[in-house]
Amino acid sequence: MAGNAYSDEVLGTTNWLKDKSNQEVFSFVFKNEDVQLNGKNIGWNSYRKELQEEELKSLQRGAETTWDQSEDMEWESSVDELTKKQVFIFDSLVKKCLFEVLSTKNIAPSDVTWFVQHEWGKDQGWHCHVLIGGKNFSQAQGKWWRRQLNVYWSRWLVTACSVQLSPAERIKLREIAEDQEWVTLLTYKHKQTKKDYTKCVCFGNMVAYYFLTKKKICTSPPRDGGYFLSSDSGWKTNFLKEGERHLVSKLYTDDMRPETVETTVTTAQETKRGRIQTKKEVSIKTTLKELVHKRVTSPEDWMMMQPDSYIEMMAQPGGENLLKNTLEICTLTLARTKTAFDLILEKAETSKLTNFLLADTRTCRIFAFHGWNYIKVCHAICCVLNRQGGKRNTVLFHGPASTGKSIIAQAIAQAVGNVGCYNAANVNFPFNDCTNKNLIWVEEAGNFGQQVNQFKAICSGQTIRIDQKGKGSKQIEPTPVIMTTNENITVVKIGCEERPEHTQPIRDRMLNIHLTHTLPGDFGLVDKNEWPMICAWLVKNGYQSTMASYCAKWGKVPDWTENWAEPKVTTEINSVGSTNSPSPKSTPLSQNYALTPSDLEDLALEPWSTPSTPVVGTVKTPNTGETGSTACQEAQRSPTWSEIEEDLRACFSSEHWKSDSEQLPNLD
């Protein structure tokens, strides 16, 4: 197809139809019948009453513009003005019905694909074809749509009827329109149940092969069948002339024709064995797609996010088992197709990354309290959550109470959503809740005891089978584990016997994060949006959640004795560039002097103010009285007055120092 041989409108319409060639839509037909009420004849052209609503007037003007722009200038149409006006009114009423049904379903018109064409048939007279569909449409909703459109269509026809009718006659006309179904839906009859079911059609094929091939009506009254005008959601066919419509149909047919046609022979026995999906199966599949799309992983989430489908299944025979099996398929789909890191990352609001500061998050502040490189720690955790840690498949937060272990683990588990919890109280089936999950959470882990081998297999990301209560054994696929504890879980005791042979294998399976800094009582919880933003920040800045990226950034794979403090982070909390940083003026804090020398109080000088944020490793830990490491204390301890005096003597000569000393005021 040569690009210069056809107009942009023709090529644009052809490509638009090709993009939507396989989109399934409903096919409706709007019509009216000749009615006689108490001697009053009401025909197809008896609905020319002036429309009062502004929206209907706007739709009518749009139909008039479409008619004028699509007329061929080479010949003049002889359709009379009354026929044109009737078609314009019908077009506005049909679109008004569609928009009202969309508003009841809270569907935006921009999310819907539709096509409307008014035609005249030799036997049927005037009728209007409507194709409509979108992502929120399902085959099971077809009959509901027909009923709603039938109600709105009958109501608006009565409103537009130009024949003088009494209130009782108007009600009767509306009843006739609803009972005779002046809005019909394309259906098919099931061979076994003998019931009618909605038949969806392919949007692009239906428009190109059927509607665009028809001739335009140019006489009044119409002698042959054809179309008056058409419009669509993409504004592609509205202004096309008859010849351009035929050209689009031909180009579409040529482009969509398969190069080779495979012929298959189906025997009568195979046809008999052919299985057609029931309405119930279609409904379950549609519901399952919505649950996976919205990441529903629990009955409570289902009740809150999809109450209609939950009630529909609950009302069916065996509804509880149906709910349980549907939810199990949903969690299995998420566990097999997504990692915990993927589920966290997709919740991130990337538009806020511009003003996002990693150092100001509560998680990184907890790590910074220990003098660690919080970027390195978060990068290692993300690698494990993305199943890239290899045998080291478990993130272990351990240390004293109130150091932030559980709040970090809770934030990660909440961001993942599809989480299974280890139940230590269930001695026989502790992993009953851990199948088909993206993350396993072990809270307050203790002595593994006789379950140590099963624990080691799960913590290393192996595929094992576990026993379930009241069921057979079930397989657990490689799943990341996040664990918190106050105890030394590397020491395994079975009965009264200590088993040291398990210590090193357990360490080889753990990402060791030892938290020792007690948090203040007003520290607060980690925000639910914090970890999605952390993951998005890491990806944006080149810290991919793979072990290859981790080794390229930090040199080696993390082990049990990993030094999280090296290399030093370039921008610390409350440093210049952070939102909590102090003003960049010369203060003792900017010179790494954390405390006021006690000698200044004896000299009656104004003491230095204590900084609001202590330097890591210099101030005693609250509640415990423990100090930081010896290296940090030596590097950042406060200078004494004698040391300052020695520095001053070194800066000035002895004569200058003596003359200046004689001029000092008497402080006593």
UniProtKB/Swiss-Prot annotation:
Q: Where is this motif: RCR-2?
A: 127-129
One record GO biological process: symbiont-mediated arrest of host cell cycle during G2/M transition
Q: What is its EC number?
A: 3.1.21.-, 3.6.4.12
User: Carries keyword Transmembrane helix?
Assistant: no
Region of interest called Disordered, as start-end residue ranges on this chain: 571-592, 605-643
User: Tell me, how does this one assemble?
Assistant: Homooligomer; when bound to DNA.
- Briefly, what is this protein's role? Multifunctional protein which displays endonuclease and helicase activities required for initiating and directing viral DNA replication. Also plays a role in viral packaging and transactivation of several promoters. Binds site-specifically to 2-3 approximate tandem copies within the origins of replication (Ori), unwinds this hairpin region and nicks one DNA strand thereby initiating the rolling circle replication (RCR). Cooperatively binds Ori with host PIF and probably other host factors, which activate the nickase function of NS1.
Q: What does the UniProt entry state concerning the protein's domains?
A: In the N-terminus, the endonuclease region is involved in binding to the origin of replication. In the middle, there are the ATPase and helicase activities. The C-terminus probably contains a transactivation domain.
Record-given protein name: Initiator protein NS1
Organism per entry: Parvovirus LuIII
The gene it comes from is NS1
